[in-house]
């Protein structure tokens, strides 16, 4: 079967890899000159299934009001007056209750855990190198309330069979030695020892090379104008004067998926702006060993080989990609507070990107009302974490193979009135990755 994939970020390239492995003839189209040059370029570097959780959570509306008056707030909103922004925010607010939070987190953890199995199998099969580490993730708490509130997430982790360790402040240095100097600022942490880290852009570039060797065609520097429709099917993709035809089509356009699908499929995918710093390491003993996540500021600090990646924050500001100095100051403040001697912050590279976010936090992976159109988008801040699992899942659905995980509640149909998931089993109902 011929398959055209729109988008060469980590999700699009992973989709291409698994579809090619399944025997399909795959073409990837992207406006950039190479893979992973937008949202996948400089993210926080975490592969953290256990921390897969929606931003829409109980208490977030009240916190958002408080954050409006804080200098280093993890979330900021700038109203643009568009009906889409207001509608998306309203849908997100409706998900900010315990029932929806637990349902959405369960879906996200299910896909994220499966995705980690997939990337592990991919590593074993190909030997792909991307400055990856399997040292776990440590969530840091600065208040006693945060420490005690971890019980809610621990319940989900236990249901999903995810190993964890709840650590007091005095135990943090056993996981992250450099934190010994700042333990007095912290109340404890939640470690997930099975989580991983790695350079998402490097991974995507290397996987694109492997996919090309497997027969995938990459067409760069081509802007997609529109999808052509005949009846209940897509008949082609128009890029300027060129039209590309296939048997099936995959939209992995990230935040730009919504606009491309306008008048065809309604999806609530909105750009959530984030930032990162990439800092050269000057003292390895004073740098992080793996990844820490500052719960107060929602900032992740990740170790690559000779670099530290500091990433996070969320701005609901539309497609604004301007670098804001005050956001850099927040990233610098957090890394200097926790790892003051790890690297030269003044030499850091500052970056921003748009994460494709759904109001319930769960990505949209699967079929649409158009028979040969599939979606793989809306992964929010977890595109790197979920990419391989989403790619394998999508390949199975297109190939007519029963997926290894329940997936009916991951598709766009869940936004339809009256939708009820067929899946009612435990979160860890996962078959081994192929």
Swiss-Prot record:
Role noted for this protein: Oxidative deamination of D-amino acids.
Major enzyme class: oxidoreductase
Pathway involvement of the protein, from the record: Amino-acid degradation; D-alanine degradation; NH(3) and pyruvate from D-alanine: step 1/1
InterPro entries: DadA, FAD-dep_OxRdtase, FAD/NAD-bd_sf
The protein's name in its UniProt record: D-amino acid dehydrogenase
HAMAP family named among the record's database cross-references: DadA
Keyword entries, A-Z: FAD, Flavoprotein, Oxidoreductase
Catalytic activity line of the entry: a D-alpha-amino acid + A + H2O = a 2-oxocarboxylate + AH2 + NH4(+)
């Amino acid at each position: 079967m011929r398959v055209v994939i729109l988008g060469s970020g980590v999700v699009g390239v992973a989709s291409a890899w698994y579809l090619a492995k399944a025997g399909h003839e795959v073409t990837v189209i992207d406006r950039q000159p190479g893979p992973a040059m937008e949202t996948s370029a400089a993210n926080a570097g975490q592969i953290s299934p256990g921390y897969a959780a929606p931003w829409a959570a109980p208490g977030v509306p009240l916190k958002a009001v408080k954050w409006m008056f804080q200098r280093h707030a993890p979330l900021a909103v700038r109203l643009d007056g568009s009906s889409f922004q207001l509608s998306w925010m309203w849908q997100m607010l409706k998900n900010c209750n315990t029932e929806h939070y637990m349902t959405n987190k369960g879906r996200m953890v299910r896909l994220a855990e499966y995705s980690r199995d997939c990337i592990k199998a991919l590593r074993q099969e190909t030997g792909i190198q991307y400055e990856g580490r399997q040292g776990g993730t440590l969530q840091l708490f600065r208040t006693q309330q945060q420490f005690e509130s971890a019980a809610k997430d621990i319940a989900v982790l236990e249901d999903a069979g995810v190993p964890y360790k709840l650590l007091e402040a005095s135990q943090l240095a056993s996981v992250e030695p450099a934190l010994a100097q700042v333990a007095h600022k912290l109340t404890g942490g939640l470690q997930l020892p099975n989580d991983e880290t790695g350079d998402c852009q490097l991974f995507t570039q290397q996987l694109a090379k492997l996919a090309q060797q497997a027969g995938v065609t990459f067409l760069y520097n081509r802007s997609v104008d529109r999808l052509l429709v005949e009846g209940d099917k897509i008949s082609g993709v128009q890029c300027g004067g060129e039209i590309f035809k296939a048997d099936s089509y995959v939209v992995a356009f990230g935040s730009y998926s919504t606009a491309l699908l306008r008048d065809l499929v309604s999806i609530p995918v909105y750009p959530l702006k984030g930032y990162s710093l990439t800092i050269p390491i000057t003292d390895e003993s004073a740098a992080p060993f793996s990844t820490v996540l500052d719960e107060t500021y929602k900032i992740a600090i990740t170790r690559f080989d000779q670099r530290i990646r500091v990433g996070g924050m969320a701005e609901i500001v539309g497609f604004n990609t301007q670098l804001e100095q005050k956001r850099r100051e927040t990233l610098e403040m957090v890394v200097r507070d926790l790892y003051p001697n790890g690297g030269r912050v003044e030499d850091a590279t500052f970056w921003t990107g748009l994460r494709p976010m759904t109001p319930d936090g769960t990505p949209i992976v699967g079929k649409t009302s158009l028979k040969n159109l599939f979606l793989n988008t809306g992964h929010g801040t977890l595109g790197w974490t979920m990419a391989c699992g989403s790619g394998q899942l999508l390949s199975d659905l297109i190939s007519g193979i029963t997926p290894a995980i329940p997936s009916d509640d991951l598709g766009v149909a869940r936004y339809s009135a009256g939708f009820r998931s067929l899946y009612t089993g435990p979160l860890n109902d996962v078959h081994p990755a192929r």
